[in-house]
Amino acid sequence: MSLSNKLSIEDVDLKGKRVLIRVDFNVPLDAEKKVTNPQRIAGAIPTIKYALDHGAKAVVLMSHLGRPDGKPNPKYSLKPVVPELEKLLGKKVTFAPDCVGPEVEEIVNKADNGEVILLENLRFHIEEEGKGTDAEGNKVKADKAKVEEFRKNLTKLGDVYINDAFGTAHRAHSSMVGIDLPVKAAGFLMKKELQYFAKVLESPQRPFLSILGGAKVSDKIQLIDNLLDKVNTLIVCGGMAFTFKKTLQNMPIGNSLFDEAGAKIVPDLVKKAEKNNVKLVLPVDFTIADKFDKDANTGYATDKDGIPDGWMGLDCGEESVKLFTQAINESQTILWNGPAGVFEFDKFAKGTKATLDACVKAAEEGRTVIIGGGDTATVAAKYGVEDKLSHVSTGGGASLELLEGKALPGVVALSERQ
């Protein structure tokens, strides 16, 4: 699956067409149904505006919100998104009460002069995800014939299909893979994600460093395994470093996280790193705590003595940060997935913040720094540096699967450049 060879919205003639765009408006709402973080809506605006500026007859937006499990639920209606979308777009938006059916088709077919229509939540229909729960809460599967019909009915709403929902690209849902139009192209958000991931996965500038943190080794085995074929240096930090330290160096880790399943694989991963000439960097000192709490008592431990019983490592120490910074400074391409400590607690955020500072400096010097979604994207947002890095991915699960070497159904479904 080549990432850099997909059709994008700029390659497509939109004049006089109904442009059906799969967006990701899965935004948080408060008790008053107000959007609390409009970032995802703002992210889709350039694609919508491009379609309007290039003569689209109508722009039809489809999205999911939350997990209604295949049945209508007013709590997950997309209607509260309308005022926020109108504000950001600077024009009126028509809300359709469903995402398929005669009433929706009539609204779409009457639309002209660049009218913008937002469809109701796709996941109110079990046919979007292919599964859901019934009224009693039992798991149910969608009927195959009905899924086909649902996809045909969505297809009726456009002449051109644009996918701008990278965060859902790893899901083979109807709106991602089932739209049967001759032209299926990436929107600007999707295009940027594909460009940057192509940069690291298909032709990285070397030396190439990957920083992997987070809790469990077993969750990241495929990721580590795939990246060991691509990187020059690998930093293992965060909770999963303790599984490496205990397994490889027999370091006492006290009550720190230990992943039994992951520990069995560690020697194989280290062998592969040696075989591929990949430099493995592990933390050498730790900020420790007497409990998992923001107000815990703190201490310091090195890997020489290990972590005493009754204490747990929640961050890496200054010597580790020096090693990480040196590796960052020596690299041209840096891919970061998973924090270096429990950054949610201020006492244990230093290692993550120092690593982030080194990454920002690298990006400012013109090197490529990519943050792979999820918790690490939250870190970049927490310290307000998203625009100081080359790319912060919007898709946690999707970026993880790409980096594991998997093909993403939503990307595979897009047309290739001729």
Curated annotation (Swiss-Prot):
GO CC aspect terms: cytosol; mitochondrion
Cofactor field: Mg(2+)
UniProt keyword annotations, A-Z: ATP-binding, Cytoplasm, Glycolysis, Kinase, Magnesium, Metal-binding, Mitochondrion, Nucleotide-binding, Transferase
Chain residues that bind (2R)-3-phosphoglycerate: 23-26, 39-40, 63-64, 66-67, 122-123, 170-171
Top-level taxon of origin: Eukaryota
One Pfam family in the UniProt entry: PGK
Binding sites annotated in the UniProt record for CDP: 214, 219, 238, 338, 340, 343
Role summary: Catalyzes one of the two ATP producing reactions in the glycolytic pathway via the reversible conversion of 1,3-diphosphoglycerate to 3-phosphoglycerate. Both L- and D- forms of purine and pyrimidine nucleotides can be used as substrates, but the activity is much lower on pyrimidines. Negatively regulates the biosynthesis of acetyl-CoA from pyruvate in the mitochondrion.
Name this protein carries in UniProt: Phosphoglycerate kinase
Recorded name of the encoding gene: pgk-1
